[in-house]
């Protein structure tokens, strides 16, 4: 029986360091991005570091996009599209790479608090592959926004518990 090649043993020290750097970046992303809004904020920060500019700002400044320009458009702080302007006219088509944000979490329902058998419970939806029993052994944090309806503002808030 033929053994499959184990490429792990063939990595150079430089490749192992690069792999370690990428995994640390990924872990940092998972730690920073507990909600869609946090993930979009993180993505915008990284996009700016890579030379992307906000499309709204480009338009408001009356600038023209040129070949190679990088721009992003954010919608309601919950989704983002990033573009790199190509050489050919848009009428020739475009390449699209798409992804979605999936934040494993518990969403607390409206009026979530109830009592049964002398214990207080929170009624919640769970998303992103969580199992009902997984989260009880993990340190929890409340992440989200507070919507202030009379001012049309949303205020990000994080409360670690």
State where each predicted segment sits.
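Hydrophobic or amphipathic alpha-helical targeting/insertion segments
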Residues: 104-106, 113, 117
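A generic local secondary-structure boundary/capping motif
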Residues: 70-72, 86, 130-135, 145, ...
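Conserved small/polar residues in nucleotide/adenosyl-binding loops
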Residues: 151-157
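Short polybasic amphipathic segments
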Residues: 140-147
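Alpha/propeptide regions of enzymes that mature by internal proteolysis
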Residues: 25-57
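N-terminal capping segment at the start of a domain
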Residues: 2-36
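A gly/proline- and charged-residue-enriched helix-loop-helix capping module
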Residues: 119-137
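Acidic/His- and Gly-rich active-site-bordering loop/insert found
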Residues: 54, 59-108
